[in-house]
């Protein structure tokens, strides 16, 4: 059971046209495209947020060490 052949794809396309009508199909495709675009954008933003957290975690010990050094110099 591999990929559907051309006649099978045409039958599916005909059923979609009958169900939704020829005028609705571009709107459906546009909506799907927008949904995919928003999904990709959300994933990218999530990845960027994780990178910021990692960088922040790496920098915290340096800041704390510098603060302790300054504190010991003043004492």
Swiss-Prot record:
Keywords: Cell inner membrane, Cell membrane, Membrane, Protein transport, Translocation, Transmembrane, Transmembrane helix, Transport. Signal peptide: none annotated. It is found in: Cell inner membrane. GO terms for molecular function: protein transmembrane transporter activity. The keyword Cell membrane applies. Residues 47-75 are annotated as: Disordered. Residues 53-75 have a biased composition (Basic and acidic residues). It comes from the Bacteria. One of its GO terms (biological process) is protein transport by the Tat complex. GO terms for cellular component: TAT protein transport complex. It is a single-pass membrane protein. The chain crosses the membrane at residues 1-21. Pfam families: TatA_B_E (PF02416). Belongs to the TatA/E family. PANTHER family: SEC-INDEPENDENT PROTEIN TRANSLOCASE PROTEIN TATA. The Tat system comprises two distinct complexes: a TatABC complex, containing multiple copies of TatA, TatB and TatC subunits, and a separate TatA complex, containing only TatA subunits. Substrates initially bind to the TatABC complex, which probably triggers association of the separate TatA complex to form the active translocon. Part of the twin-arginine translocation (Tat) system that transports large folded proteins containing a characteristic twin-arginine motif in their signal peptide across membranes. TatA could form the protein-conducting channel of the Tat system. This is Sec-independent protein translocase protein TatA. It comes from Sulfurovum sp. (strain NBC37-1).
